[in-house]
């Protein structure tokens, strides 16, 4: 029995019964409920930030829960308690007679710790009381001005190793970086602890939402606390930074990613669901609830979710959608759109009818009116990665599998780079009368680290840093914009182990000879033998080639089995999220690391994890901050701390000693 369950056991008239119902789950999550400890406080909120209260209550056999109420600090919450049973629609293992009691969209303006409780009564009058706690984090007196704009740059999977590798590719000599990364020039740096609510190793959903809700979510869940129902869209909610600042200040929201826009990181800024894969409902929520988030810019891949079912490339289904009754408390209390099962919906046309410009290509993006909201969908699912986009633009590497470039194989030769998307997003959002929150994600740092495709994630990190430069330049010019650069987690346990001791030509010859003796013992240079790899940077900001002599070598500590020859992979792996992945030429792409052409080298690196991909790690990740309020981001912090620091800067003003990091434009790197 949980130590915080207080059984108010009322005897029957005969005095024969002393049983009572049991509270099996209490939300928001707390150690007080789970273990009886008051510390640490798990759930924290801003003054006035909205969240849901919920309890799962199992009655005695043959009984039914007939009433429930919630209290905060002993005072009843003055809101309707919705009560439903689990006769249908609950997860496996939850008894059918279990009742779920919910109060939607509560808030507290009183700073400090609070105890909340649920009191539930079953049909025979037996009662149960369970307690939890949460904290309202106060705003503090400001020492500086409020920030008008917040830009969050999220390098998905980008740990310290990924940042370091990109810096080395940018140029090193005698131990010094020749062309420091833009993110290296930021004023302040912190280390972020990344764990989710249910694991030391987070996935991208809670990795993102922790930054913009102030609370931990379970893996695979976005903007919600876990519950016992199977419905992916009815979980207890917590208000996002975008929703809070739009509701209280009128700020607008921009979301930019190189992934499919339904993916965990972009969705984790505006969408509430316990299933990060429920694509139809996720993109519907972007549009239908834009009045709650202020969504003004949405760019990335993911066209398949916006096209009516039956259209070639469409992935819309009713099974990944939602529909609530207009009388549902979720609709009434949160003000959300009820939704409908409408797989035939044409969301592109609906965005356009609502006044959004639509850009399916870079050419259309360049022409889009910066005074109008913007929808950009440049691929059916994830966009191509930087290495393949750059090769497509240069026209020199015909490394696709149908005679052209990789982007030609995907049918998407005119995709923008992330920095181009970032610049356009800022040009649109700077017209926001009350300021904006903008999230920019370099998504395939993570996706290519999963694939253990070193050169592709290194160039995606360079692409991401070019977007960082765009944001930094804007912040420097405006003086009222706080920019942070961080990651949701590290991916693959990447380790920069040294440099090749041979030329690329010799490396190719050794690969042909095969085996460990040639590809490890004859190639890997450690310590002083690693030297300084020299990548020549072209005018477009990327290496002329990644197959250089004496190249940088990267190993992995969280890898699956792979074959390694250290050379650039000719093609990316097959992206199974693409709607045409089973058709030529995309079906010809390798399914995993063991099916690549370099498997012919027969140097098998045995993995530490099962499956075909490298995995996320629990390693802390760097965070760099620039602009007013940057100096609040120092030390070792929890990912949820970031939310409160951002909100403080936007709502009350800068609290760290005044800094002028946004007042002077940083120098551009010289070539």
Language-model segments: what does each one mean?
Residues 86-103:
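Aromatic sugar-binding surface patches on proteins
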Residues 18-47:
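Short, compositionally biased P/S/T/A/G/V-rich stretches that sit at domain boundaries
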Residues 105-113:
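Surface-exposed, short loops/turns at beta-strand junctions within beta-sandwich domains
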Residues 1-19:
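Gram-negative bacterial Sec-dependent N-terminal signal peptides
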Residues 86-91, 148, 155-209, 218, ...:
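A post-motif C-terminal structural segment
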Residues 51-61:
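Aromatic/hydrophobic beta-strand junction motif of beta-rich domains
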